[in-house]
Amino acid sequence: MNEAVSPGALSTLFTDARTHNGWRETPVSDETLREIYALMKWGPTSANCSPARIVFIRTAEGKERLRPALSSGNLQKTLTAPVTAIVAWDSEFYERLPQLFPHGDARSWFTSSPQLAEETAFRNSSMQAAYLIFACRALGLDTGPMSGFDRQYVDDAFFAGSTLKSNLLINIGYGDSSKLFARLPRLSFEEACGLL
């Protein structure tokens, strides 16, 4: 049986973690990005399908390619973040299932139903984006996930001619706590949950 993580770890991952909009000028190394992926890849996905594909934008040139896709409210925070991750999903993720889920012909589940394939890819890549956020937090980084961007522009600018489609953006770095807003409330258990 697994042991519960420490209260300090819970604070780092959940209760004290914040969505950051301002960033310290501390770089995030490529090795750290590899460590993030090395952790997040172990998060569960249905039939181990692992549809997320990530582009880590960490250069000024990459940010300029991304700039036209950003909403006005997300522009400055993204241009100043050390890294912006484009979390995309592979519409043909099922081609990797013989490698990832060799227990049966899982590939055929999705080749026979394009709607199921798209729903599965989008849902599971969204879960993987959450794993990325928690991997960042576990390694001492802060994040700022965003859905306010022109997905079609990103797909055309970064994924043209491929099977990838963008899902969301996540800024990554070491947050400037002086630029945080007051913490917003969350729903109580009674407001959000039911017991049957």
UniProtKB/Swiss-Prot annotation:
BP GO terms, sorted: nitrogen utilization; uracil catabolic process
A GO term, aspect molecular function: 3-hydroxypropionate dehydrogenase (NADP+) activity
The reaction(s) this protein catalyses: 3-hydroxypropanoate + NADP(+) = 3-oxopropanoate + NADPH + H(+)
Gene3D superfamilies to which the protein is assigned, alphabetical: NADH Oxidase (3.40.109.10)
Cofactor: FMN
Keywords assigned: Flavoprotein, FMN, NAD, NADP, Oxidoreductase
Induction: Up-regulated by the nitrogen regulatory protein C (NtrC also called GlnG) and repressed by RutR.
Alphabetized InterPro entries for the sequence: Nitroreductase, Nitroreductase-like, Nitroreductase_HadB/RutE, RutE-like
Superkingdom per UniProt: Bacteria
SUPFAM superfamilies recorded: FMN-dependent nitroreductase-like
EC number: 1.1.1.298
Annotated function: May reduce toxic product malonic semialdehyde to 3-hydroxypropionic acid, which is excreted.
Family to which this protein belongs: Belongs to the nitroreductase family. HadB/RutE subfamily.
Protein name: Probable malonic semialdehyde reductase RutE
Top-level taxonomy: Bacteria, Pseudomonadati, Pseudomonadota, Gammaproteobacteria, Enterobacterales
Recorded name of the encoding gene: rutE
